[in-house]
Regions:
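Conserved acidic residues
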Residues: 19, 101-103, 136
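Residues at the C-termini of beta-strands that transition into short coil/loop
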Residues: 25, 63, 80, 177, ...
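Binuclear metal-dependent hydrolase catalytic cores centered on His/Asp/Glu-rich metal-binding motifs
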Residues: 33-57, 61-64, 69-107, 111-114, ...
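Conserved beta-sheet core of the metallophosphoesterase superfamily
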Residues: 13, 22-23, 111-195
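Active-site beta-strand termini and strand-to-loop segments that position acidic
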Residues: 68-70, 168-169, 198
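Membrane-embedded segments
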Residues: 1-58
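Solvent-exposed loop/turn segments at secondary-structure junctions
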Residues: 1, 27-31, 65-67, 81-84, ...
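N-terminal post-signal-peptidase region of extra-cytosolic proteins
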Residues: 6-8, 61-62, 87-92, 152-160
Length: 199
């Protein structure tokens, strides 16, 4: 919801990166949880997108961008939300990326990651004759690592890929605990900003 973003706009607008700041929408960026008429919900969703663009962020809505570094480049792809509400289109986000390129996928909910493995991506998302490149690295959030962890037990521990680094068929997923949460409390589950260095 745009109202949840508003108090942090000034701070988030100060984020800068040499190759730009990229983002995707998560389930709370839509009006799925808002008790309002459809026109009000649509306006709120449009305002959230407008706010991210005004902050100078590259909001990836089932699309990709190319980041160049000298003679090398990587693709940064991003999907919309997978469920509640379901707007993700993996094929659209990856379409046009040729095999042999490194793909970094931004995806709020991590549960669909296994369907993007090299052995499954074209079966699940590809059209006949189409070759989609499996992302080598996917970054997700959504679970907040359960927000509460007691002796390693957390509410999300049985959810697929709820926290940490996972590997499958040479591709990796990292699900972060992030900074926010459903309620403003964390016990034994620290908020985090993760730095990943690509070499």
């Amino acid at each position: 919801r745009q109202s949840e973003l508003k108090p942090y706009v000034r701070m988030l607008s100060s984020l800068r990166a040499k190759d730009g700041v990229y983002s995707v929408l998560g389930n709370h960026d839509y009006s799925y949880y808002v008790n309002a008429d459809s026109l009000t919900c649509l306006r709120q969703e449009q305002e959230t997108r407008r706010q991210e663009w005004q902050m100078g962020w590259h909001l990836l809505l089932n699309e990709h961008a190319v980041v160049h570094r000298g003679s090398d480049s990587i693709y940064v792809a991003g999907t919309e939300n997978f469920k509640k509400p379901a707007h993700a289109n993996v094929a659209k986000a990856l379409r046009g990326i040729r095999p042999g390129h490194f793909v970094l996928m931004l995806q709020h909910i991590p549960t669909q990651w296994e369907d993007m493995a090299p052995s499954r991506i074209n079966l699940v998302y590809g059209r006949k004759g189409e070759v989609l490149v499996a992302p080598q690295l996917t970054l997700s959030g959504h679970t907040h690592a359960g927000q509460i962890s007691v002796f390693g037990l957390r509410p999300t521990m049985f959810a697929p890929y709820d926290y940490g680094l996972y590997e499958r068929e040479g591709c990796q997923l990292f699900t972060t605990a992030g900074l926010g949460g459903v309620v403003p409390i964390r016990v034994g589950s620290t908020a985090e900003i993760v730095v990943i260095t690509l070499k």
